[in-house]
Amino acid sequence: MTMAKLFDKVIGIMGFADDDYEDDYFEEEEEKEEVREETRGTGNRKGAQVVSIHTQKQIKVVVMEPQAFEDSQSIADQLRNRRPVIVNLENAERNLAKRIVDFVSGATYALGGNMQKVGNGIFLFVPNNVDISGEMKDDFKEKGFFWSLTK
């Protein structure tokens, strides 16, 4: 390093350097920052349209077998937390099963979700972020719900 460069550096550190040189330096930085901001703005629009599969949250399905009417509130809580619930009422009494299905189907409707009978005494309740494909409605018309059958 030459003596002139060393002297200029010391003068610059002390604040006695030529102001024109500093102004040019800061103007260049400001121009670069503006360009960066414009680039960021266009990048966000492109990024909003692309969804990576790996960033999607995995949905967990909850399986419950309620033994009392009070268990229906925990089923509704799972739906409120946007989790699908499979409810097994095969071993429940008919009146209890009907009350639970009435309560949970009302909660599902209020949350904008759907329900579907999967099997005899087994129901699928899903929140509004989950779609059910495949319908079994014709089976309901022919066979009815399990609590309406006489044994």
Swiss-Prot record:
It holds the Pfam family SepF. It comes from Desulfitobacterium hafniense (strain Y51). Keywords: Cell cycle, Cell division, Cytoplasm, Septation. The gene is sepF. InterPro entries: Cell_div_SepF, Cell_div_SepF/SepF-rel, SepF-like_sf. This is Cell division protein SepF. Homodimer. Interacts with FtsZ. It is found in: Cytoplasm. HAMAP family: SepF.
